[in-house]
């Protein structure tokens, strides 16, 4: 588990809300506090989707960010930044392990926290270390300026 403080909030938020940077992730939970607090549980309701999308996303437990991004953008767009924003991204590996990236904005500070949950308990931390490195490489690849805390 590694935490990074994002140094340039505006460019990061543009990538998060307006670009496809995070679209390969799914969202397990999102919380937004603007004029009212909003909590989004990312569990997909496959019956609500079109038949094409239901087939396309049938393997997913959580909603792809690609589908949720426009909704979140509509909730927070405007002149004021939200008081609080937290998005828990998840990414499943082929063996079922779950890597996560929690994005949190609060009191003007933006952080990302890498998380890793193996399918089975293990004392071996190689997969967790690899996920942490992949998250760091992801930030670097997308030119997201950050400092490890």
For each feature predicted by the language model, list its residue ranges.
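Surface-exposed, low-hydrophobicity interaction/linker segments
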Residues: 56-109
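Generic structural motif
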Residues: 9, 32, 41-43, 90-94, ...
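Mixed-charge, glycine-accented linear interaction segment located at domain edges/termini
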Residues: 112-149
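Charge-rich, low-complexity N-terminal segments
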Residues: 1-63
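Generic alpha-helix detector with strongest preference for long hydrophobic helices that associate
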Residues: 3-6, 68, 101, 108, ...
């Amino acid at each position: 588990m590694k935490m990074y403080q994002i140094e340039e909030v505006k460019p990061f938020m543009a990538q998060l809300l307006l670009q496809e940077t995070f679209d390969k992730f799914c969202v397990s939970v999102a919380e937004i506090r603007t004029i009212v607090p909003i909590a989004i549980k990312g569990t997909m309701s496959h019956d609500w989707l079109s038949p094409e999308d239901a087939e396309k996303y049938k393997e997913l437990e959580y909603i792809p960010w690609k589908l949720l991004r426009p909704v979140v953008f509509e909730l927070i767009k405007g002149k004021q930044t939200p008081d609080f924003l937290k998005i828990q991204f998840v990414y499943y590996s082929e063996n079922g392990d779950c890597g996560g990236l929690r994005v949190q904005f609060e009191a003007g500070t933006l952080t990302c926290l890498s998380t890793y949950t193996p399918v089975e308990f293990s004392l071996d931390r190689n997969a967790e270390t690899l996920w942490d490195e992949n998250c760091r490489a992801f930030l670097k690849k997308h030119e997201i300026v950050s400092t490890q805390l």
